[in-house]
Amino acid sequence: GVLALLDGANTLNSGAAALDNGLGQLTDGLDTLTSNNAALNSAAQQVADGVLASANKTLKEGGLIDNDMTWSDYASVIDNILTMNDKTLAAGRRKIVRTVWEQAPSFKDSQLDLALYLSATKTNHDLEAALKLMQSYDPSMITGLVQLLTSEDAKNAAHEELVYQVKNSQDMADVAALKTSLSQIQVFVSSVNQYTAGVQSAADGAHSAKDGSAQLAAGTQTLYDGVNTLNNGAGQLSDGTVQLNDGLNQFNDEGISKLTG
């Protein structure tokens, strides 16, 4: 019985030692991963901030924003741009004139509206042709034309044309896509942060398990040592019992038998 108990204690001790060793390897691996957490989080944020800085530069150059967007307000800022406010229309005016009349001087809004109206009429004139046409007219003819085209109906038509061109421009499509890109980069940063937090949590759990397994291994070793001591004591007890039995037999043979002879 004692030998069976000793064998079981030995098996338990070996298993506890193997568990402790395995958890030691796991904690070492997780510690290596967690040592890179700060670098990963920082790198992800740097990538995101670089994208945001590029977006700010592009929108500023387009005249769509004056102040830099932040991660907390970029969505509302871009939504505001896409609602066709005065800043968007002003940027649209500059964009249209810049692309079709690169060398033109700075125009007032009323002149731009007039040029846009001329380009929007069904006369097969683009903006450049309309401006050249204005320059070639006799001053008195230009005065009459301006009076005609700056009527309320003409202004409304020019404004509607400008709204249509800005709203349907590639620039506005790019602005809408920019919002999606910034949202995706935020998801990327959040995912990296969640990963590193998960690694840290796993490492903390592994360390707790490792501490427990070390205590278990120490306990099973103590148990094994105790059973082994018991086994050795049982052997000594057996030897002592034999010796006692031999002594009693000898005492009986040499003492008691002679007395009762």
Predicted regions and their residues:
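Long, amphipathic alpha-helical coiled-coil
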Residues: 1-261
